[in-house]
A protein has these predicted regions:
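Catalytic domains of cell-wall/extracellular-matrix polysaccharide-remodeling enzymes
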Residues: 1-100, 104-125, 130, 136-138
Length: 139
């Protein structure tokens, strides 16, 4: 991908978001597709005054898009337990973690992980966590 292709593609995304009142100023975080980036993508993102972000690995939260027919499939229960186990075993818990969840997943994935969010939020709140938006986390 060239620099111009990257900038053009990103601008097309912002043009579409503008229809919903979302601007580059209000949405200045960039999570690359498939969480893949290199030094060029990082530099181009910075040139566009955007903040490159990525999820924190280790919890399997990013596997919520997988479907049962895939080799790397993880059920919502597996993902939920992985997050809980990580929180319990890691000395710092999940402080500062960015969990990635997909609101749009394949129809073949019937156990949508976002359906477990109320359980996860309740668990984390009982452990004393305060959930914040990414712009608050990265101030």
């Amino acid at each position: 991908m060239s620099k111009q292709e990257f900038k053009s593609d990103l601008q097309k995304g912002y043009d579409e978001l503008k229809r919903f009142g979302v601007t580059k100023t209000s949405a200045h975080f960039f999570l690359p597709p498939y969480e893949w980036y290199n030094d060029s993508i990082a530099a181009w993102t910075k040139e566009m005054n955007l903040q490159l972000v990525n999820f924190t690995p280790g919890t399997l939260s990013n596997a919520d898009y997988t479907t049962p027919d895939e080799k790397n499939y993880r059920s919502s229960e597996t993902i939920y337990q992985s997050i809980i186990n990580y929180e319990q075993k890691n000395g710092s818990g999940l402080n500062g973690f960015i969990l990635l969840m997909h609101i749009g997943t394949d129809a073949n994935r019937t156990d949508k992980f976002y359906s477990r969010l109320p359980d996860l939020i309740q668990y984390l709140k009982t452990k004393g966590y305060q959930l914040v938006r990414i712009d608050e986390l990265l101030k």
